[in-house]
Structure formats: structure tokens, C-alpha cells
A protein has these predicted regions:
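Extended, highly charged accessory segments
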Residues: 1, 77-78, 92-93, 102, ...
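Single conserved hydrophobic/aromatic residue that forms the stacking wall/gate
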Residues: 1-6, 11
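Flexible loop/turn segments at secondary-structure boundaries
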Residues: 16-17, 23-26, 121-124, 131-134, ...
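Short histidine
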Residues: 17-18, 23-118
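Gly-rich Lys/Arg/Thr-decorated short loops/hinges at beta-loop-alpha junctions or inter-strand turns
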Residues: 39-41, 85, 338-354, 380-385, ...
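N-terminal leader/propeptide and maturation segments of large enzyme subunits in energy/redox metabolism
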Residues: 48-89, 247, 258-259, 456, ...
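Phosphate/diphosphate-binding loops
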Residues: 97-106, 111-120, 124-126, 143, ...
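Conserved structured catalytic cores and adjacent interaction surfaces
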Residues: 353-357, 362, 368-428
Length: 497
């Protein structure tokens, strides 16, 4: 296993979500405060400059330990189990514990087997995927051996009391003071009981933001002008958009692409085309998003990022969750109504006689003012474009505001929600989320679907069914893109660009 001298944690293999975790740790630093430390600024940056993925995880693990969180709890915060409310075999108190811990930090996804200590506990554990072997043996003379390979240390079989391997998300540990080995279930039972006050106000928004009474915003010539403005062609509508709503999955085509690179093309190409998707290589395996979807999640969290060093206050604030970051037109309207005065619309268009640079500076300042006034939901919208107002490329707008708010130490107080006419295929959604978007409403894609629905091109499907199938295809595409990078959870992918 990899670890530096003096480390409290070491890992075998790597952390796929390192870039996103590192970026979000900068956001958590903005809220960090504890009476245990005279000057919290002495702990920043938590992740040392130039640190590797294993060193970065060790830095955060150590921070949680010295702030009073025991090693098993810190492990579950950083490298949580894969779990779902649909899992009827999972005890309710375990569900409540996992639900709370998953709402506090972004998971550090492996593949990784880890070992760590806080001088009270010594633990060994696997990440949610369990792709790295971690075997253990307990001897009659009260010794626990754990490692990635059998035969690391010669043991007389007569000494062994029990042995086995840890599965996905499982943990084993020794509480040094008591001289006792705790199994996976015993550790989680202990934590669920010890921290049963973790009754955070987690509110599921899926029941409140239902897909119903879907309507279009634009039609006729107005719709066509907007499609032209955002570079949406008839080919895009027929070969990309239509199959997604009809088949509830991404369109497939023949292999081969002789399209020039966006940077070399003499035709208009949206900013999304200048980005390429990463993929896992060599010892860093991808995930099968179809057969391993139980360990993957698009669950999206809203609400302020709390102080990770103060669990008492973390349990007092409302945390809102959705099962998908993609919102239909009616869902987005309900979303804005739900948050009311806690939301603010940032107009991402600019007059034709202004420069793009000045427009970006303007929306950055608008976002800062809104957050300082107590807004928790920013709505970035290009819907107000007209013959005299041009849209700021939404990818540029989201990235600019996300990085600006981090610089101003305000990002942890707000979610960035996008209402975009550009977003059409899964790649555009993935890049928007990758630069920091919390949710995306592709209003023009839905209006374009309605145009085709009116022409009766979707047969027996209602328009609401077309919308649901389109969102389902986008969700599947996002899971596929994440899985190629070996990332299981959307919150770890978000902001990782």
C-alpha cells in the first residue's frame, strides 16, 4: 500500500475522483471552524500543494481525526458504502447514518483498499466497488493481520482463529484501548448507535418536483431562431434528440468520425466540442454502468455545505436531494417556486455592443451580490436572448461563476442551477456538471421535442412520456461517462474539470 512516513492512512491503488475532491475541499475550507484550534487558518490548505491522491486523502482523514471524528466514522465519510433506500436488508439505523454521511462530503472513489489509524482505532477497509483485494486473518493471540495479498506474513494455520476477505464497502478494525476486533457489522452498529443524533433534515424533492403538465416555452419562428442561435441543426434533432425520446437511450451510429477537431473547424462549434471525455487506463479500471449500477448514483444535493468539523450544526440544517440533476421545464418552474426568495436568476445574455469579457465580469459580480444577500440557489439562464441580446456560452458562464465564488470563499453557500438552450446531448450535460452545475434544465431541447410531438412523430407516447424518456437517456449517458472514468457518484464528478 502507498503511504508516506507519518501518514495516518495509506491506500492500495488510486483515487479516481481526486480532482473533484481537491476542488471541493477548497470549498469546505471556507466553512471550517472549531474551538479545538486557536487559528483555523493554520490548517489551510488542508491538502498540501502537489500532494498525490493518496497523500490528499490522508490529509483530509487526519483533519477529521484531530477534530474528534474516530477513524471508522472518517472512513465512512470519505469512502462510503454504496447504498439505496430500495435495499430492504439494510437496517434502518444504518440507512440514516449513511444518508447523513453522504450529505456531508463528496465521496473519494477508488478503486482503493485502505488502512488507517487515529491512535484509538486501527482499520482496514474497501471502497464501494471492492475492486481491490483486502484479506485479513485474526489469530488466537489477539492479532489482526490485513493486507492486499495472502502470504505476506507466514502464519501457522493453527494460530488462526478466523480469516476472510472484505467485500465492497466493508471495514474491519481494532479498538486499541479495549483490545477487541470489530467486524464490519459491529463497527456500523456501533457508529449508528453512537451517532444516532445524526437526524439531519434531509428532504427528498422528487415527490415535490414531478413531471406533469409539460408545456413549451417557444414555438414557430421564435423556436427556429433560437435553435439557429445555439447551433441546433435538423441533423441534431433527427439523429440525436429524437432517438433519445423515442428509445429512452442514446442514439447509436457507425464507427468513425472524420469531423475536424473543434479548434481546427471553420464552422461554428459549441464550446462543449472543445472538451474531450477522460477514460480509465491500465490499472485504473472503468465501471460497467449497466451491470454495476447498484454502486452508482446521480443523487444531487442542495443546500449550504456545512462545517465538516462541527457535526452538531450539520444536523440542524435542511439538505435537499434529487435523484437526477436533469430537470424538465415544469420541474424547473416548481424548483424556482419551491425556493422562492432563496433563489436568484442571473441573466446570461449580453447586449451586442458589449464584450463577452465584460459580460462575464458582470454575471460574476451579480452572483457574488446575490450570495452575500443570502440566496442559496443561483439560476443561470440564457432564456432572455433576443435580436439585440446574445447568449454567453453556458459552459463558460458556469465555470466562470463557479471558480469566482470559490475565489471569493462563497461557493459553499450556494448551488448553481442552469437553464440552457445549448444543452442537448449527454456530453453537453456532463461538461456543465463537470465545471460545477448542480442541476440543468435544457428548455430548448424540450421545446424542440414538443415541436416534433405536435407533428405526431412519437406515435403513442404522450409528451410527458417523451420528456421522461429523454431524461432517462441523459441519466444513462451520464452514468456511462462517469463509469469510463471509474467514478461512481455524481457529487464526486461535479466540479472536477
Amino acid at each position: 500500500m502507498d503511504g508516506l512516513v507519518g501518514s495516518e492512512m495509506c491506500i492500495r491503488d488510486r483515487i479516481n475522483t481526486y480532482r473533484g475532491n481537491k476542488n471541493w475541499m477548497k470549498v469546505h475550507e471556507q466553512e471550517m471552524n472549531s474551538p479545538l484550534f486557536d487559528d483555523i487558518e493554520n490548517l489551510k490548505p488542508v491538502i498540501q500543494q502537489g500532494a498525490s491522491d493518496s497523500a490528499a486523502l490522508d490529509n483530509v482523514f487526519e483533519l477529521l481525526n484531530i477534530s474528534g471524528q474516530p477513524a471508522p466514522l472518517a472512513k465512512l465519510m470519505l469512502v462510503p458504502d454504496a447504498w439505496s433506500k430500495k435495499n430492504k436488508t439494510l437496517p434502518k439505523d444504518h440507512q440514516q447514518l449513511f444518508n447523513f454521511l453522504n450529505s456531508t462530503m463528496e465521496p473519494w472513489d477508488g478503486p482503493a483498499a485502505i488502512a488507517g489509524t487515529d491512535n484509538e482505532w486501527v482499520i482496514a477497509a474497501n471502497d464501494r466497488n471492492g475492486l481491490r483485494p483486502l484479506r485479513y486473518a485474526i489469530t488466537k493471540d489477539k492479532l489482526l493481520f490485513a493486507g492486499s495479498e495472502t502470504g505476506m506474513i507466514e502464519l501457522n494455520e493453527k494460530r488462526i482463529l478466523s480469516k476472510g476477505r472484505l467485500g465492497p464497502g466493508e471495514i474491519i478494525g481494532v479498538r486499541i484501548e479495549k483490545g477487541k476486533v470489530f467486524t464490519n457489522k459491529q463497527i456500523k452498529d456501533y457508529l449508528a448507535k453512537e451517532y444516532k443524533h445524526f437526524n439531519s433534515q434531509i428532504i427528498d424533492l422528487d415527490d415535490k418536483l414531478t413531471i406533469e403538465d409539460e408545456k413549451n416555452s417557444f414555438s414557430g419562428d421564435d423556436l427556429r431562431r433560437r435553435q439557429y442561435t445555439f447551433g441546433i441543426s435538423l441533423e441534431d434533432l433527427e439523429l440525436i434528440l429524437h432517438p433519445m425520446a423515442e428509445d429512452a437511450k442514446e442514439a447509436t451510429g457507425s464507427m468513425g468520425d472524420d469531423t475536424p477537431l473543434a479548434v481546427l473547424s471553420d464552422k461554428y462549434r459549441p464550446l462543449y466540442h472543445f472538451f474531450r471525455q477522460n477514460f480509465s487506463q491500465v490499472t485504473n479500471p472503468p465501471i460497467d454502468s449497466l451491470r454495476e449500477n447498484k454502486v452508482m448514483s446521480l443523487k444531487t444535493r442542495f443546500g449550504n455545505l456545512g462545517n465538516i468539523l462541527d457535526f452538531d450544526n450539520l444536523t440542524k440544517q435542511n439538505i435537499y436531494v434529487l435523484n437526477s440533476p436533469i430537470l424538465s421545464n415544469s420541474q424547473f418552474e416548481k424548483f424556482i417556486d419551491f425556493f422562492g426568495n432563496n433563489s436568484a436568476i442571473i441573466d446570461c445574455t449580453f447586449a451586442e455592443n458589449n464584450s463577452l469579457y465584460d459580460a462575464i465580469k458582470t454575471i460574476q459580480k451579480d452572483a457574488e451580490i446575490a450570495v452575500r444577500q443570502g440566496v442559496t440557489q443561483l439560476i443561470l439562464s440564457d432564456k432572455d436572448l433576443s435580436i439585440s441580446k446574445l447568449p454567453i456560452p453556458m459552459l463558460l458562464a458556469v465555470g466562470a461563476i463557479n471558480s469566482y465564488l470559490i475565489e471569493k470563499k462563497l461557493r459553499g453557500y450556494v448551488s448553481i442551477n442552469v437553464q440552457s438552450g445549448e444543452a442537448l446531448d449527454t456530453h453537453s450535460f456532463a461538461t456543465l456538471i463537470g465545471v460545477g452545475a448542480t442541476t440543468v434544465n435544457p428548455y430548448l431541447a424540450f421545446d424542440s421535442l414538443y415541436q416534433r410531438f405536435e407533428k405526431k412523430l412519437f406515435g403513442k407516447f404522450s409528451f410527458e412520456e417523451c420528456v421522461e424518456r429523454y431524461i432517462k437517456s441523459i441519466n444513462a449517458g451520464l452514468l456511462k461517462i462517469m463509469s469510463k472514468m471509474g467514478i461512481s457518484v455524481l457529487s464526486s464528478y461535479r466540479g472536477g474539470c
